[in-house]
Regions:
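C-terminal amphipathic alpha-helical "assembly" element
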Residues: 1-32, 111, 115, 119-121, ...
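N-terminal beta1-alpha1-beta2 module of alpha/beta enzyme domains
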Residues: 1-82, 198, 275
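Glycine- and other small-residue-rich loops at beta-strand/loop junctions that grip anionic moieties
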Residues: 11, 65-68, 92-95, 174-175, ...
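Beta->alpha turn/N-cap motifs
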Residues: 37-39, 126, 196, 254
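Internal, glycine-rich beta/alpha segment that forms the wall or movable "lid"
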Residues: 44-46, 58-60, 90, 96-189, ...
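Alpha-helix-loop-beta-strand connector modules within alpha/beta enzyme cores
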Residues: 49-90, 146-158, 214-222, 227, ...
Length: 277
């Protein structure tokens, strides 16, 4: 059984030099993938107020905006140039932030910088302040999902046209849990699906994706399932084995500034290395 561990190094609330140290330290520890986030404003989350919702995984009870923040796509290129082994990506790029043809070109370029390690992570965004701060319309969730459905084929088509093309198959990760539109896009196009929330929600959403894959004629097993392993925020069971039982083989932790502590990363890597082959 192959289980891989990802780490989202949040590009907020700290200095770039410390963030770079986190990337290299995580690579040395054996992390399989490094991710960033794509926000235009830093978030300050009141963890004591965090609540869970069946539809969307986690709803931050009190989220303030403010503090240091770095732009996500530039961070991806920096991670690609700084490291040599882990896969590189973002969880995830809100689809409305960039022209889809440009986003494909950016992804292809970082794929070459990383020597073929890039994952293109897409979603619909959720933080109103991100959109409004930079002058983007904060559309309804349904409209953003329709934008995702429209733009993903454009991105895939542009990747085929670029010269040079990506170095190999460039995996497409989609983080969407809307059953009417977003998850159908996952069934049709995604190589990786990032699902999140309490285990009961994850279990139910996996069954929905199985049904949607049947409807579009896609083999469900072609899609790699990923989730956040973030018990301190989501109030989850600390036991990562509950996700393996649902077929999830890629667990993504989060390290936050200003120090980007890797203590939990060390623990989960020790668990991964103890698993039977």
């Amino acid at each position: 059984m192959t289980v891989t561990i990802g780490l989202t190094v949040s590009p907020q609330h700290g200095e770039m030099r410390e963030m770079r140290k986190c990337w290299t330290s995580a690579e040395e520890l054996g992390v399989d993938a490094l991710y960033t986030a794509d926000h235009f404003t830093a978030m300050i989350v009141d963890r004591d107020q965090a609540t869970r919702t069946a539809a969307d995984g986690v709803e931050y009870g009190k989220t303030q905006v403010g503090g240091m923040n770095f732009e996500g796509s530039t961070i991806e290129a920096a991670m690609a140039a700084t490291t040599s082994r882990p896969r590189i990506g973002c969880i995830c790029h809100p689809i409305g932030f960039r022209n889809p043809n440009l986003l494909a070109d950016m992804a292809r370029t970082v794929d070459h910088v990383s020597d073929g390690r890039f994952i293109l992570g897409l979603g619909t965004g959720f933080l109103r302040a991100d959109f409004e701060e930079y002058g983007y319309e904060y559309a309804t969730q349904a409209d953003r999902a329709r934008e995702l459905a429209r733009d993903v084929p454009i991105i895939k088509d542009r990747l085929k046209k670029l010269n040079p093309p990506p170095m190999g198959k460039l995996p497409l990760l989609i983080a969407s849990m809307g059953e009417k539109i977003g998850m159908r896009v996952v069934a049709e196009h995604a190589d990786m699906w990032h699902v999140f929330g309490p285990i009961e929600t994850i279990r139910a959403k996996i069954q929905v994706l199985r049904r949607l894959c049947d409807e579009v004629g896609r083999d469900f097993n072609e899609i790699e399932l990923t989730t956040n392993y973030w018990p301190q925020i989501l109030g989850r069971d600390d036991d990562p084995n509950i996700y393996l039982a649902e077929g999830i083989r890629h667990l993504v932790l989060v390290a936050e500034g200003p120090k980007w502590d890797l203590g939990q990363v060390r623990e989960i890597l020790a668990w991964r290395d103890s698993l039977p082959d």
